[in-house]
Amino acid sequence: MGVSRVLHVEGGTPLKGELRVYPAKNAALPILAASLLTPEPITLVEVPRLRDVEVMLELLAHLGTQYAWEGRTLHLQTPEIKSTHAPYELVGQMRASFIVWGALLARAGEGHVSMPGGCAFGFRPVDQHIKALEALGAEVWEEDGTFHARRTRPLSGRVVFDLPTVGGTEQAMLAVALGGEATLVQAAVEPEVVDLGHFLALLGAEVEGLGSPIVRIKGAPRLKGGTYRIIPDRIEAGTYLLAAAATRGSLTLEGVRPDHLDALLDKLWRSGHRLEVGEDWIRFRATPDPAPFHVEAREYPGFPTDLQPIATAYLATVPGQSTVVDRIYPDRFTHVGELARMGAELYLRDRILTVQGRRLHGAQVKALDIRAGGALVVAALSAEGASEIEGVYFLERGYEHLTERLQALGARVHLRESPVALAAD
């Protein structure tokens, strides 16, 4: 017999208290990749201590980066690129690590990156990454599951994306930041993309149009170092707000960017909850009788796809009928079957999820990706009775100190070890 960890949740207790939002993982990862662009020292203040960040640091160390933690501050320096190959054993763990491709191409003139891995929901191609690098003048090819790129001059050109793409936009920005120049059309406008642009500007690149569909970037022949603070995590903040809503609790978030959460805050307000918003704080008080609503996940500033599963879990507790559509990842519904085990009434047809809210009950469930895991936690917190959530690995990729933070809000949760039968030889 082997042993795995499960999250044990005794549901039915409203979450109450205050919470400071951690920095955004989805902003930290491309900024970490951007550290490859300069030989100068970089200091990142308040970096999330998550498994995905550790994987990215392992990859950067393989490529030549030296780093050291000082509390939650991270010091990095890449005097030289020691390898231009990002191996499968690291890239296969996390899709975001694919972003080092553009940075390697800019700094070393070539980059070789294995097919990305990470959360297995829907079809998430890298065609827009390839299109961008080719439009900028790189030679790109794929062989045996590895993507290769090479350049003979600084990359420059005009990239017209087929659709807004966060990863593709970030890849192109990194590829031209060191001596190149580009105009990106249909660029992603997400806060994490804007944060990367601000970081590149700190290093010496000229970036215009951040937060708009047309971004212009002019790289510098040599980038400098600097100190940077990463934006707060809007997905973590949204998860805790939805957990407070599902448990009919109250919550104050500090160190948050409310303007990054407009779509969610509007839904919660329309659902009947009370909200007060300041420059960097949100006060939330749940109504005991919330109303259902329609969720349509879209590109920013629309409703975030990463909050769609968590919102689904909340709506499963709201009397009445709600509907959920994901325009980013239309098949992002790995959480539906597990929520059904807790008594949720969910009907998926033609990629439209209909949710009939009711009181949930505890069950043994399994997280199949990061945000599906967040959805199960929210459902379990609101449910009657005990739940056990397998797949703690996914939760630890997306939520720092989740158990301790929920306990601080009054939740009855703890991690425990569970025996697992091992496969026979």
Curated annotation (Swiss-Prot):
Functional pathway: Cell wall biogenesis; peptidoglycan biosynthesis
Presence of keyword Cytoplasm: yes
Positions of UDP-N-acetyl-alpha-D-glucosamine binding: 95, 124-128, 306, 328
Record localization: Cytoplasm
Primary location: cytoplasm
Pfam families the record matches: EPSP_synthase
Enzyme type, top EC level: transferase
Active site location: 119
Cellular component, GO, one term: cytoplasm
Modification sites for 2-(S-cysteinyl)pyruvic acid O-phosphothioketal: 119
EC number: 2.5.1.7
MF GO annotations: UDP-N-acetylglucosamine 1-carboxyvinyltransferase activity
Keywords: Cell cycle, Cell division, Cell shape, Cell wall biogenesis/degradation, Cytoplasm, Peptidoglycan synthesis, Pyruvate, Transferase
Function: Cell wall formation. Adds enolpyruvyl to UDP-N-acetylglucosamine.
UniProt record similarity statement: Belongs to the EPSP synthase family. MurA subfamily.
Protein name: UDP-N-acetylglucosamine 1-carboxyvinyltransferase
The organism of origin for this protein: Thermus thermophilus (strain ATCC 27634 / DSM 579 / HB8)
Gene label: murA
